[in-house]
């Protein structure tokens, strides 16, 4: 299982070697839980293709909002963001 990241800064994301897959998840949302479970079914393949960052949007809402702002995307949950180069 992937571990949750408590601190993330877009300027420190290194996506040169492989893309970074940011998964924003809420454990209070059944749709988010289903989405995370589907991603976990493909965990081995995803780990080969990308560096995976998992964010709990309930526990780390401020970081989740900051990340959305830095990347210029709307804050959603569930949400998958791919950062490449």
Which stretches of residues belong to each language-model region?
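N-terminal "domain-start" segment that seeds a small globular fold
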Residues: 1-11
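Hydrophobic/aromatic beta-strand patches that form the interior of the parallel beta-sheet core
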Residues: 3-5, 22, 53
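Local sequence-structure signature of Cys/Sec-based thiol-disulfide redox active-site neighborhoods
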Residues: 10-44
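Thiol-based oxidoreductase modules, predominantly thioredoxin-like and allied folds used
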Residues: 24, 48-64
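Short, basic/aromatic recognition patches
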Residues: 65-69
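Short loop/turn motifs at secondary-structure junctions and domain boundaries
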Residues: 71-74
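A short, hydrophobic beta-strand/beta-hairpin element that forms part of a small beta-sheet core
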Residues: 78-85
